[in-house]
C-alpha cells in the first residue's frame, strides 16, 4: 500500500531513487521516467520544502524528493543503480490509488472505497469519544498515526457524527427497546444512575405540585361560591380530613369521634353539604352566645384551625343535634341562600342598625324568633319576617281587632311611644286624607318629620270632636266613647283635615289598646298611658 502510494505521487518520476530507498522490487525502464518542465521543477522544490515537516503527510510521502531533485538533470545513470536489474524492462501501471489529491494531467481517476482495519477503527472511535468535531491538526495527526489520508479521516468523522445523530433521534418502537435506551448527556456520554433517579424524582414532584395546585384552585372556587359552602364546606373538609389538598380523592366523612366537637362540627364536616337543613333553626352565628350558654358549654365545641370564631359557633336551637344526621339539602337551595345572610347583619350594634335603617332590632330577634319561627316557618328560617311576628303574637293574645300587615317595617330600637302617638296630629292633612290607613299601619314613617309637641291620644280625639263628627260618622263607629280632657292641647299644625287619621276605627275607644300596641314592639308604655 505504501509502495503504490509512493509511485502514485505527483513526483513519481523520481520513482527510481524512491524505489532504492524502500526496496521496490519491480525494475523501472526509461519509459517510466518523464522529462520535467519548469513548473514540475518548482513543484519538486516545494515538495522538498514540505519534507522539512517530519510528521506531516506530505513530508512523509516526499521525504526523498530533495535528494532526487539533484539527479533529475541526468536520469539515465540513476536508473541502473536504482533499479538493480537494468536489462529487464517490465511495464508497470501507475494508476489504482486511493488518493483523491492526485494531480494527473490525464483524465480523473475513480477513487476506490477505503477499507479500515480493526485497529484503525478502534483508534478512530477513541478519538470520536474524546471529541465529535476534531480540528485539522488533530485529523492530520490521526492520519499520520493511522497511515491514512487526512481527507479520509475527515470523511470518517462526518459519517460517524451522522450515525450518532440517527441513533440519538431513534424512538422506541412497539415491543422493542430503543437504540438509546440508556439516557445520555448532550455530549453522548452515559448518564449517572443517581442523576437519572434525581430527574425522575423531580418529574414526580412537579406532577404532584401541579395536582395540588389544581385541588387548591377547586377548593377556592368552592369557597368563593355564593351559598352555604362559603362558611362551612371547604375549611371543615381541610380540618376533618387532615390531609387537605394532598389527597387526590375527595375527602371522606369525619369519623364518629368528630361528634365530640359539637353539632356544628358534625353537621358541617362533610364537604359539599348544605349547612342548614329544612327543619333546623337559624344558621350558626345568628344567635348571641348569651342567649344559649347551656348549649355552648354542654356541647364543648372547640374552635377549629383555619376557621373564624364567628363561624365556629354551634347552631342555636334544640333541634340541631337531632337534625345533624339527616341528609343535607342542596347548598344552592333557597334555604341555604337565605340563611347565609343573617350573620353579617347580626354583628351590627343597636345604634348602627338604627342609622343604617335595618329592619330589625339586633338585641331582640334571637329568643322570640326561634319560638315563632318554629310555629310558622319551619322550612324558611328567615330573619326579617320574624321581627314583625312578635307584635302579631301580642295582638292575637290581646283585644286588638286588626293585625299589622307583613309589609310594614317594625319600629326602630329607641322607645318611640310619645312621638308615635303625637304623630297622628303632626302628619300633614292632605297625605293623611289620601291614605289614612298608611298613618295607622306605619307610625314610625309618620313620626319621621321630627319629634312634635307631646300630646296624648285622647287630646287628639278631643280635637276630632271639636272639628266635627262627620269623619266619625263616615267610619261608622261610636266616637263619643273618648271623653276629651280640656287642659291638653293638640299639636301646632293640625290643619282643617288633621282629624282624618283619628277618624278611622283606630281612634275609637274599643280599638285604643290595639292601635297602641301596633305602633311599636314594646307594649308596656302604651299600657301605662291608658
Swiss-Prot record:
Top-level taxon of origin: Eukaryota
Start-end of Low complexity biased regions: 228-240, 420-430, 455-476
Keyword annotations of the record: Developmental protein, Differentiation, DNA-binding, Homeobox, Neurogenesis, Nucleus, Transcription, Transcription regulation
Primary subcellular site in the record, as a coarse category: nucleus
Compositional bias annotation for Basic residues: 206-224
Pfam families in UniProt: Homeodomain
Similarity field: Belongs to the paired homeobox family. Unc-4 subfamily.
Stated name of the protein: Homeobox protein unc-4 homolog
Organism: Rattus norvegicus
Amino acid at each position: 500500500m505504501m509502495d503504490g502510494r509512493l509511485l502514485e505521487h505527483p513526483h513519481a518520476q523520481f520513482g527510481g531513487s524512491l524505489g532504492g530507498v524502500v526496496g521496490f522490487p519491480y525494475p523501472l525502464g526509461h519509459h517510466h521516467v518523464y522529462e520535467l518542465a519548469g513548473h514540475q521543477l518548482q513543484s519538486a522544490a516545494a515538495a522538498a520544502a514540505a519534507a522539512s515537516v517530519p510528521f506531516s503527510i506530505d513530508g512523509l510521502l516526499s521525504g526523498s524528493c530533495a535528494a532526487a531533485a539533484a539527479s533529475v538533470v541526468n536520469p539515465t545513470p540513476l536508473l541502473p543503480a536504482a533499479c538493480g536489474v537494468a536489462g529487464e524492462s517490465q511495464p508497470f501501471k501507475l494508476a489504482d490509488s486511493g488518493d483523491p489529491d492526485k494531480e494527473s494531467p490525464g483524465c480523473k481517476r475513480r477513487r476506490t472505497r477505503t477499507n479500515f482495519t480493526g485497529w484503525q477503527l478502534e483508534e478512530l472511535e477513541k478519538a470520536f469519544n474524546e471529541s465529535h468535531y476534531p480540528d485539522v491538526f488533530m485529523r492530520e495527526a490521526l492520519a499520520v498515526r493511522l497511515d491514512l489520508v487526512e481527507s479520509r479521516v475527515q470523511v470518517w468523522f462526518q459519517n460517524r457524527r451522522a450515525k450518532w445523530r440517527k441513533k440519538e433521534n431513534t424512538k422506541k418502537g412497539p415491543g422493542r427497546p430503543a437504540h438509546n435506551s440508556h439516557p445520555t448527556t448532550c455530549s453522548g456520554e452515559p448518564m449517572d444512575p443517581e442523576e437519572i433517579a434525581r430527574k425522575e424524582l423531580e418529574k414526580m414532584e412537579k406532577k404532584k405540585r401541579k395536582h395540588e395546585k389544581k385541588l387548591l384552585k377547586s377548593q377556592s372556587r368552592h369557597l368563593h361560591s355564593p351559598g352555604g359552602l362559603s362558611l362551612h364546606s371547604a375549611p371543615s373538609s381541610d380540618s376533618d380530613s387532615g390531609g387537605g389538598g394532598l389527597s387526590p380523592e375527595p375527602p371522606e366523612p369525619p369519623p364518629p369521634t368528630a361528634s365530640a366537637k359539637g353539632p356544628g362540627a358534625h353537621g358541617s364536616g362533610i364537604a359539599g353539604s348544605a349547612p342548614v337543613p329544612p327543619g333546623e333553626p337559624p344558621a350558626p352565628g345568628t344567635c348571641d352566645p348569651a342567649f344559649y350558654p347551656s348549649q355552648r358549654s354542654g356541647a364543648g365545641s372547640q374552635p377549629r384551625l383555619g376557621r373564624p370564631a364567628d363561624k365556629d359557633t354551634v347552631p342555636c336551637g334544640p333541634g340541631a343535634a337531632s337534625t345533624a344526621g339527616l341528609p343535607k339539602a342542596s347548598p344552592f337551595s333557597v334555604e341555604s341562600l337565605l340563611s347565609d345572610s343573617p350573620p353579617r347583619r347580626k354583628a351590627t350594634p343597636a345604634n348602627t342598625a338604627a342609622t343604617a335603617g335595618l329592619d330589625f332590632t339586633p338585641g331582640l330577634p334571637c329568643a322570640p324568633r326561634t319560638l315563632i319561627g318554629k310555629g310558622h316557618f319551619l322550612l324558611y328560617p328567615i330573619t326579617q319576617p320574624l321581627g314583625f311576628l312578635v307584635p302579631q303574637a301580642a295582638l292575637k293574645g290581646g283585644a286588638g281587632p286588626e293585625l299589622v300587615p307583613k309589609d310594614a317595617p317594625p319600629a326602630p330600637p329607641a322607645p318611640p311611644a310619645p312621638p308615635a302617638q303625637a304623630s297622628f296630629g303632626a302628619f300633614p292633612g292632605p297625605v293623611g286624607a289620601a291614605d289614612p290607613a298608611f298613618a295607622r299601619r306605619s307610625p314610625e314613617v309618620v313620626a319621621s318629620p321630627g319629634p312634635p309637641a307631646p300630646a296624648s291620644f285622647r287630646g287628639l280625639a278631643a280635637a276630632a270632636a271639636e272639628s266635627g263628627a262627620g269623619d266619625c260618622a263616615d267610619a261608622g263607629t261610636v266616637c263619643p266613647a273618648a271623653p276629651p280632657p280640656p287642659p291638653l292641647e293638640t299639636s301646632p299644625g293640625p290643619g282643617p283635615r288633621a282629624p282624618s287619621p283619628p277618624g278611622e276605627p283606630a281612634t275609637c275607644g274599643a280599638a285604643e289598646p290595639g292601635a297602641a300596641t301596633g305602633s311599636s314592639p314594646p307594649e308596656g308604655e302604651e299600657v301605662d298611658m291608658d
